Amino acid sequence: MRLAVVGHVEWIRFARVHSIPPAGGIEHAIEAWEGTGGGGGVAATQLAKLGDGCLFLTALGRDRVGEDSRAALEADGIEVHAAVRDEPTRTALTMIDDAGERTIVTLGDRLHPLAIDPLPWDRLAGADGVFFTAGDADALRSARTARTLVATSRVLDVLAAAAVRLDAIVGSELDPAERYTPIEPAPDLVVRTEGRRGGTWETADGRRGRYQAAAPPGPIVDTYGAGDSFQAGLTYGLARGDDVEDALALGARCGAAAAAGRGPTGGQLRAADL
């Protein structure tokens, strides 16, 4: 299948701690490492692992962090096409506590691709599946030339401005920044996630139901990236022709596997796991 992501990537500095320090407190890291993150980068990595690579249209700063981000993504089998900005690549600090829960502080503005950027937008035409995490309205319209288009509700203003039909939109009932409110035209599928409780879904033709969270393949290590991996799995399932329930089940498996691995991509499902 031909798969792609249009969106953002960030460079993350991770610290594993016993607990998140209270205001004014100090906590010593048990372990520290760095790597790519952000919804677009995590989803592109998951799609590349499930399929035969992934096209990623994004934006990076003209800096060492941008170079490191590109190299890390390409090492995971992703074909990266990035507009280069004078602004710095966004970074973030992420603490992971003993329960595997993550706390994030972002540093700098999110960089995302624009339709006027000299990127291979024509390669989205007829793609089996595209996941959209960030960009302008015209970038989303270019993504709509794909056979299947899924988007995150975190960029609801862009989705509303573009006014294109989405095959699916994923929102969160736990994160106010990702709460879905109706847009026109109505997406074919609206998914509202509830973390470890699974979530709900409804279609434009009136069908609705719940899906269950999948059991992780091991202890929960790190929830960073679980939601992005879920959305990538859903995109993959819809792109290969799964019905709603089966696509959501695959997404749930991807999210659970990611939570059982180190960092956002260490535990992600691969094609051999399907």
Predicted regions and their residues:
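Ligand-binding loop in jelly-roll beta-barrel domains
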Residues: 89
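Conserved phosphate-binding/catalytic region of the ribokinase-like
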Residues: 181-274
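A glycine-rich beta-to-alpha transition motif near the start of alpha/beta enzyme domains, typified by
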Residues: 18, 53-81
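Glycine-rich phosphate/adenosyl-contacting loop at the front of the ribokinase-like
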Residues: 1-57
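Ribokinase/PfkB-type carbohydrate-kinase core domain
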Residues: 1-9, 70-84, 92-209
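Short active-site-proximal "capping" loops at secondary-structure junctions
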Residues: 10-12, 61-65, 265
